[in-house]
Design a protein with these regions (language model features):
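Sequence-structural signature of the catalytic-core scaffold of metal-dependent phosphohydrolases
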Residues: 2-107, 116-205
């Protein structure tokens, strides 16, 4: 079926073996400082799902990240990047004095903003999006909604803990600044901030 074919590409039966962060790389994670918030049981449960752990084997820079590093730092995984983005969401929420519930939703949106990425990230997305008629944003929504049984552990957590439509609205950039939506929708958003930082590290800046 189409869903099974999509899952094969998503989970990596076709190309995941080409995109692996080696164990030696994982020993020295380039994640943001100030990550105490991630120790919260809810965030831990999300990062321990098969849906999120899948991102551990996907390089942030895609095919470029599999080459020899140019600068002093290696490429990170999509999982590490997602934790960095969630960290930025937490720091901004704290600075803006958002309440605990809104902060929680912004951080979870940060963790899940790349949950639908294909192996090799943007390097193959153009091809696979045309082949499967779906991009990583739409795939992320399918995973969040529990449409793939193999990755359904994430949805089981979310449906009892958060407002899923609000999380998806944040990721679709449909939420206003009054509820923190600008940290995802502005031109210089938290995803872009960490992306620029990690790319700079990789090339030696």
């Amino acid at each position: 079926t189409r869903m099974n074919t999509t899952f094969d590409y998503l989970f990596g039966k076709k190309i995941m073996k080409l995109d692996k962060v080696t164990a030696s790389f994982k020993e020295n994670k380039q994640v943001s400082s100030g990550l105490d918030f991630i120790k919260d049981d809810l965030y831990q449960s999300i990062t321990n799902t098969s849906a999120f752990k899948r991102l551990d084997g996907i390089t942030f820079l895609g095919a470029i990240g599999l080459t020899n590093k140019i600068g002093k730092k290696r490429d990170i995984s999509r999982a590490e990047h997602s934790i960095n983005v969630a960290s930025l969401a937490y720091k901004i929420s704290t600075a803006r004095k958002y309440d605990e519930e809104l902060t929680k939703h912004l951080c979870i949106a940060g963790l899940l903003h790349d949950i639908g990425h294909f192996p090799l990230s943007h390097s193959v997305e153009g091809y696979l999006s045309k082949k499967l008629n779906v991009d990583h944003h739409a795939l992320g929504n399918l995973i969040i909604d529990g449409e793939f049984p193999q990755l359904n552990d994430l949805h089981k957590i979310l449906k009892n803990k958060v407002n899923i439509p609000f999380i998806k609205s944040l990721l679709e950039k449909e939420v206003g600044k009054d509820l923190g939506g600008d940290i995802f929708s502005s031109q210089f958003n938290i995803d872009t901030i960490d992306g620029i930082y990690q790319s700079g590290l990789f090339i030696g800046y």
